Amino acid sequence: LRYALSVRTSLPVADHKLVQIVDAALVEASRKSGDWLVCRKGCTQCCYGPFAISQLDTLRLQKGLSDLRSSDPKRAVRVRQRAQQAIKRLSANFPGDPKTGILREDEEAEAAFAEFANDEPCPALDPETGACDLYDARPMTCRTFGPPVRSGEEGGLAVCELCYHGATEQQIAKCEMVPDPDNLEERLIAEAEKQTGKHGNTIVAFCLAG
C-alpha cells in the first residue's frame, strides 16, 4: 500500500529546538506535579483513538520510522504493518480524504472525528510491551498530554483523567505546562506544509503506512 503522505521531505532543522523546549517544559511540569502525574511506560489509555497531527508531526514520525528501519528493521516493519491494517479498518468512515489522509475541517467532519474509532490503537504502540516504538519522534499532542495544559477557545486547563486525583484546582494550576511560549511550532508547521505541499492535519496511521 502506498499513500500520498508517504512522500519523504526533510524535517525542518528547528524541530529539534522545538522538541527540546517542549520536553523541558514537560520535565518542569512533572517536577511540580510529583505523584499526581502518573504517566509511565505501559499506561496506554491515551494511545487509543486517532487524534489530529500536523504535517510537522508527520515529518518527525516518518524520520523516526526511517531511523527505526536502520536500528531495528523488524520492529519498523511491524509498525508499518499496523499502520496499514489500521487504514483498512478506518478508511470507510474516515472524516477526510482517505486517499491523502487529510482530515476535513468543516463542523460536520470535526464532530464525526470526535467520535471516530475511539478504540483504535495507535500504530506506533507495541501491543506486547505497551511502549511507543517511535517515542522520541512522537507528535506534540503526545508530548503535552497528562500535565495541565491550556486548550480550547476559552483556554481552560486540561489534564489526563488518570492524573491529579486529590489535587485542588489551585494545586493543578500551579503545575501548568507551557509547552511552546514563543509559538515556534506554528512557524515550523507552515514550513513543513510548504515543503510537502500538504496542508491540513492527518492521523498517525496515514503517515506511517507508506
Where do the model's predicted regions map?
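Short loop/turn segments that flank or connect secondary-structure elements
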Residues: 1-210
